[in-house]
């Protein structure tokens, strides 16, 4: 880092410590409401079967209570801001406010007082998700959904402004008297009308944003609204896009470079600058309320018609996902400090609500990810932000050129693995043993993984990692690949099909845990036999990135044996083909100095 870098780091660390003292009371626990929530959840709630040591070490999390959607992430005057849906009174959903945390590095966080709470007629019964937009003068504006009726979730869109734009911490927000600024008129379903996006400014001087909705019984819709002043908004004649997927929550719409660069693009600049517009594609992401996952398409934005057209006509059917695991309500933002786009996503617990109440916390945010367009132009790539590497221990454990024979597993020793970062490069000896893919499962990775889990012997694979494993392997979470020959279609030969799967079905001996397999197909060419995997392990989180970020899976697991020093890490191969570990590098991960006062 150097002397100057060290001094700068210490300077902002001192700032954060002072802020933490000022913000010490920002997360207040109301024990009486937690008791009420517990009583409503179960009769006589016992102590949680989730061990306290399974609380995450380096993922974003407040000290107590419930969190869900990340809201309005931004970079402002040297500080990263994250707002998020938060219940200050308990570990179940309810009493939602916009909690607010700030950071210099996206790793160490200090919680400030809530930024937005129910306080006006337009949000008296709920302050739900929304986004931030940087105005022309660099000042942020927040648009968010309010609920304004007690009898029904009648949803309107409101605006909030910083009281003092010169405050880099944006500690106070005000709601103008003209709220709500957007209401569900013209036949819009008022109970399914929420989560405004970051706005973008067109060459005509109008700001535009999207609001997610449901048309009829099953059509997800992204309505376009226009405004010159962020006060008076007009709905466009046609939606930006729609598809028969069910309700679209938390829409996100942003440009990505299409010329091979990994740089992010500011949401507005790509529209105003015609030259830049020619070098970008657009991403439309929606969170599916019924299925509880996020999917996206890559396509073209027609600014004159105000329509978005996916490059793949079947994109809304095939559902490319940010993450094939426990990851929802995501939101991106452009980081001008490092010219990158960063993705946040919420990961809920997989235990019971009664356990959440008993242990006193529920929900985390995934590690922030840098996202950019794959050179193929067909999908995004995702990778943990570089800052997370600062938490790595000084001395990694390295395993090189180790052949793992069929049916063999190899323990990785020399470090504690309950909180670790593992990168591994595999080489498959031969693809000849690959099984033929069942045509019935050609588009259903989840079903395929459930049927052919980590312990089901195969041809090429399953091979990968057993993480958070107990010494006797009674508990283990498997993250693995399996390679298939393509399903026969007219006798033609295609490239091998790669399945990535996380199998937590043996992750815990505790009962009543939600332990589904998660899986996705990896759009990669493995004909050279090479593929990589990275897993961030954090006590009760396994967050994995396959083939350089082409497929991602986050899973929540709650071992009863593989906890702390008792957690083990293995490389395994349950296929017929030999697998070589070209290189495995594993680091113990430290805790951040500050995590919202926890």
Swiss-Prot record:
GO term, biological process aspect, one: carbohydrate metabolic process
InterPro entries attached to this UniProt entry: ConA-like_dom_sf, Fructan_Metab_Enzymes, Glyco_hydro_32, Glyco_hydro_32_AS, Glyco_hydro_32_C, Glyco_hydro_32_N, Glyco_hydro_beta-prop_sf
Reactions mediated catalytically: Hydrolysis of terminal non-reducing beta-D-fructofuranoside residues in beta-D-fructofuranosides
N-terminal signal peptide: 1-25
Glycosylation sites: 164, 189, 348
GO cellular component annotations of the record: apoplast
Enzyme Commission code(s) on record: 3.2.1.26
Any one Gene Ontology molecular-function term assigned to this protein's record: beta-fructofuranosidase activity
CDD domains, per database record: GH32_Fruct1-like (cd18624)
Classification via PROSITE patterns: GLYCOSYL_HYDROL_F32 (PS00609)
Keyword Metal-binding part of the UniProt annotation: no
Pfam families in UniProt: Glyco_hydro_32C, Glyco_hydro_32N
Entry annotation: catalytic residues: 69
Subcellular location: Secreted, Extracellular space, Apoplast; Secreted, Cell wall
UniProt keyword annotations, A-Z: Apoplast, Cell wall, Glycoprotein, Glycosidase, Hydrolase, Secreted, Signal
SMART domains recorded: Glyco_32
Class in the EC hierarchy, top level: hydrolase
Main location: secreted
Family to which this protein belongs: Belongs to the glycosyl hydrolase 32 family.
Role played: May play a role in sucrose partitioning during seed development.
Descriptive protein name: Beta-fructofuranosidase, insoluble isoenzyme 2
Gene field: CIN2
